[in-house]
């Protein structure tokens, strides 16, 4: 089965392809109109992107949305994780907002939602969570997004 992945992120394309290949699913990319992420949850945004791509291509489409939610900040940055603060300053912004906050109040979780929309209207969705704390400073040089502080 051929499936479109609604992303321009080369790492995600490679990762999805590797995971789905043993199931006989071939991931493809397409020049897609970027869907506006107007959802209030990660699951809604994943659906919006997958549905838009499916409508545009007529093929099964998969999309994801993910981000970091910090308890002390009432769930910020949440669905705005990729657009939170200025690019390159997101981690520093979080650390500044949590400056002086004790460890026991630095709880956070990472949410990842994935959605697959089929041309016949079928929808498959899943959501997962990883719980932890926000560090007081960045650790390590590798990692993606908020990884060095989570």
Q: Where do the PLM segments sit?
A:
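Anionic-ligand binding patches
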Residues: 1-4, 11-150
């Amino acid at each position: 089965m051929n499936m479109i992945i609604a992303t321009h992120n080369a790492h995600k394309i490679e990762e999805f392809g590797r995971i789905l290949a043993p199931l006989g699913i071939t991931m493809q990319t397409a020049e897609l109109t970027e869907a506006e992420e107007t959802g209030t949850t990660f699951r809604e945004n994943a659906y919006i992107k997958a549905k838009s791509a499916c409508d545009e291509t007529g093929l099964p489409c998969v999309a994801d949305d993910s981000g970091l939610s910090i308890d002390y900040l009432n769930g910020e940055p949440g669905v705005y994780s990729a657009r939170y603060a200025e690019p390159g300053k997101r981690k520093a912004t979080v650390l500044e907002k949590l400056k002086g906050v004790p460890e026991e109040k630095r709880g956070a979780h990472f949410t990842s939602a994935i959605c697959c929309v089929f041309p016949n209207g079928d929808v498959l969705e899943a959501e997962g969570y990883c719980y932890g704390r926000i560090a007081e400073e960045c650790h390590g040089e590798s990692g993606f997004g908020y990884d060095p502080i989570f």
